[in-house]
């Protein structure tokens, strides 16, 4: 399993598409992911706080079956189903997702839906069949780790990119819901004794400009809001990201990415919200900065 990401086998047909089995990305990653800043130029830092919608493919689906269609005049679609692996309970720990994308000239659009049962175990855990204890919390980001007891996690999103000459404009929206909190027997701990649902809404706006074929600059603003839950105030995360890339050759480039995030309100753990840029440990304060400078060679 190369770097722990994907490992799968399957069949492919130029007439219908492909059918694969193994450890794979979900449909939100496949269809919306390519339109996000994290995939295009911003890397891990350019993704949402804690990669809450998994558009940056932090998590994969194990024991999954995936269908990916061929392109029908620019339209592609597909779905993923991951077996829960619990004897006698077919739906427990199951994961399924659907997605579609369309590309025509300068326009690219996509939409996807992800449904995860007992996500603290099935998605964030290393194995859906690992025994659960009362203290098992596989979620690490304080943005949502307090919702480990959710029976179901849902992600619904859509995105669009439009290119005008050397400029590309991007907009991505996602709604993330942790449903039926308090399911400690199957999902995870609930120290805050929460009940009901927790909902987040995220908007990512971006602008990429190619000054020359080799030199590009990207800007992003991301806003994540967690709705009030169980009498707690809402949480809000504002992030700005800047990226500069210079291609030294067809396979080698040097880039710098800088992100700044500021948080407010009450996070999922019931504490004052702290900044949580994706890819680094959450801050101990409400503000955080992350900078990456790298030389990249593609093999």
Language-model segment annotations:
Residues 31-37, 121-125, 181-185, 231, ...:
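Outer-membrane beta-barrel and related beta-rich outer-membrane complex signature
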Residues 3-5, 59-63, 92-96, 103, ...:
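Residues that define the transmembrane beta-barrel architecture of outer-membrane proteins
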Residues 12-19, 71-75, 103-108, 162-169, ...:
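Secondary-structure transition into beta-strands, especially the periplasmic turns and strand N-termini
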Residues 101-241, 297:
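Detector for outer-membrane/organellar transmembrane beta-barrel domains
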Residues 1-84, 92-114, 259-263:
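Outer membrane beta-barrel
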Residues 26-30, 84-86, 116-119, 176-180, ...:
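Structural signature of outer-membrane beta-barrel domains
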Residues 44-47, 75-81, 135-141, 185-188, ...:
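Flexible, solvent-exposed coil segments and beta strand-coil junctions
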Residues 248, 285-299:
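Outer-membrane beta-barrel "beta-signal"
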């Amino acid at each position: 399993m190369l770097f722990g990401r994907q490992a799968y086998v399957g069949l492919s047909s130029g007439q219908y598409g492909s059918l694969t089995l193994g450890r794979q990305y979900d449909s939100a990653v496949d269809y919306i992911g390519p339109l996000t800043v994290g995939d295009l130029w911003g890397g891990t830092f350019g993704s949402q706080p804690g990669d809450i919608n998994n558009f940056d493919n932090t998590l994969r689906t194990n024991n999954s079956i995936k269908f990916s269609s061929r392109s029908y005049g620019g339209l592609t679609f597909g779905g993923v189903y991951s077996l829960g692996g619990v004897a006698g309970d077919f739906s427990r720990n199951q994961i399924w997702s659907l997605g579609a994308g369309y590309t025509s000239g300068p326009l690219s659009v996509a939409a996807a839906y992800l449904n995860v049962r007992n996500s603290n175990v099935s998605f964030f855990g290393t194995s859906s069949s690992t025994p659960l204890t009362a203290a098992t919390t596989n979620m690490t980001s304080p943005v949502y780790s307090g919702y480990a007891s959710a029976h179901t996690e849902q992600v619904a999103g859509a995105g669009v990119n439009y290119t005008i000459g050397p400029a590309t404009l991007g907009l991505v929206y996602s709604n993330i819901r942790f449903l039926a909190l308090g399911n400690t027997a199957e999902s995870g701990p609930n120290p805050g004794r929460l009940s009901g649902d927790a909902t987040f809404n995220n908007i990512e706006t971006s602008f990429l400009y190619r000054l020359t074929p080799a030199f590009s600059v990207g800007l992003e603003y991301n806003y994540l809001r967690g709705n009030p839950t169980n009498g707690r105030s809402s949480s809000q995360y504002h992030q700005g990201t800047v990226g500069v890339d210079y291609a030294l050759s067809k396979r080698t480039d040097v880039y710098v990415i800088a992100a700044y995030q500021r948080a407010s309100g009450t996070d999922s753990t019931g504490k004052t919200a702290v900044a949580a840029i994706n890819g680094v440990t959450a801050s101990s304060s409400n503000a955080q900065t992350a900078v990456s400078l790298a030389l990249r060679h593609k093999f």
